[in-house]
């Protein structure tokens, strides 16, 4: 596979750009997660960054990418409403894996947002989307810009939700290359990787949580629920970071 030039790809007509990415993805689908990361580091432009919500399976991508690219910036968008267990998990993994953690937050504090807008997460889809734009999307865009990121790694998996079921290994999003090394992993593969490397799930996994975000928009899984129903009251699956 030849080295990909972001500017050259963006200059192509849309159909040609889609075909070029599809050809590369067909080859990447045959590689292991480790091989995908290695390929990206060799063939895609730096600077590189890895985003993480420090959710249930976060240790997998953090370990995988950091092993091949030590000191890669790890971007966390902190809303101020994460579970106490999440903040503890962040500290634990940062220390254990020696992560180069970069924390980005909204330009308005959580208290100031509530004073101005009320509890946005209780205001339906429109309120949730505004909340996500302020607390997730804008801080992430700022992080990518300030870190001069051209290649962005993330730990999404197709099995997690319908909205992720058709995502490719490689895409262009927010003006940068986006690489999803474990996109085709199932829950068993995640478990096996964690066991092999002495890593843990998020502490709330043992309490029945399949997905963990903010305290006010995360629910425990109950029989009959799809995983996406445990977030944002079932109104949305994505927080905005991986859309668009």
Swiss-Prot record:
Gene Ontology CC, one term: cytoplasm
InterPro entries in the record: PAPS/APS_Rdtase, PAPS_reduct_dom, PAPS_reductase_CysH, Rossmann-like_a/b/a_fold
Residues annotated as catalytic: 239 (nucleophile)
GO molecular function: phosphoadenylyl-sulfate reductase (thioredoxin) activity
SUPFAM superfamilies from the UniProt entry: Adenine nucleotide alpha hydrolases-like (SSF52402)
Domain of life: Bacteria
E.C. number: 1.8.4.8
Pathway the protein takes part in: Sulfur metabolism; hydrogen sulfide biosynthesis; sulfite from sulfate: step 3/3
Enzyme class, first EC level, given as a word: oxidoreductase
Catalytic activity, reaction form: [thioredoxin]-disulfide + sulfite + adenosine 3',5'-bisphosphate + 2 H(+) = [thioredoxin]-dithiol + 3'-phosphoadenylyl sulfate
Record has Oxidoreductase as a keyword: yes
Transmembrane segments: none
GO biological process, one term: sulfate assimilation, phosphoadenylyl sulfate reduction by phosphoadenylyl-sulfate reductase (thioredoxin)
Pfam families cross-referenced by the UniProt entry: PAPS_reduct
Keywords, in A-Z order: Cytoplasm, Oxidoreductase
Localization terms from the record: Cytoplasm
Family to which this protein belongs: Belongs to the PAPS reductase family. CysH subfamily.
Protein purpose: Catalyzes the formation of sulfite from phosphoadenosine 5'-phosphosulfate (PAPS) using thioredoxin as an electron donor.
Matching HAMAP family: CysH
The protein, known as: Phosphoadenosine 5'-phosphosulfate reductase
Name of the coding gene: cysH
């Amino acid at each position: 596979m030849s080295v990909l030039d972001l500017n050259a790809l963006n200059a192509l007509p849309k159909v040609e750009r889609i075909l070029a990415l599809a050809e590369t993805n067909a080859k990447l689908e045959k590689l292991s997660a480790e091989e995908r990361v290695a390929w990206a580091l060799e063939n895609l432009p730096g600077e590189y960054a890895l985003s993480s919500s420090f959710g249930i399976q976060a240790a997998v991508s953090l370990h995988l990418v950091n092993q091949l690219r030590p000191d890669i910036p790890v971007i966390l968008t902190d809303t101020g409403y994460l579970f106490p267990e999440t903040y503890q998990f962040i500290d634990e993994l940062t220390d254990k894996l020696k992560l180069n953690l970069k924390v980005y937050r909204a330009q308005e504090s959580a208290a100031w947002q509530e004073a101005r807008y009320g509890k946005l997460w209780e205001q339906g889809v429109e309120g949730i989307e505004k909340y996500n734009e302020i607390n997730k999307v804008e801080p992430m865009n700022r992080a990518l810009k300030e870190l001069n990121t051209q290649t962005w790694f993330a730990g999404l998996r197709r099995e997690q939700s319908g909205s992720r079921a058709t995502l490719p290994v490689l895409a262009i999003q927010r003006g940068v290359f986006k690489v999803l090394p474990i996109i085709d992993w199932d829950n068993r593969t995640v478990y096996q990787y964690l066991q092999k490397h002495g890593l843990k799930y998020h502490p709330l996994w043992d309490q029945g949580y399949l997905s963990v975000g903010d305290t006010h928009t995360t629910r425990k899984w109950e029989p009959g629920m799809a995983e996406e129903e445990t977030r944002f009251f079932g109104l949305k699956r994505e927080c905005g970071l991986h859309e668009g």
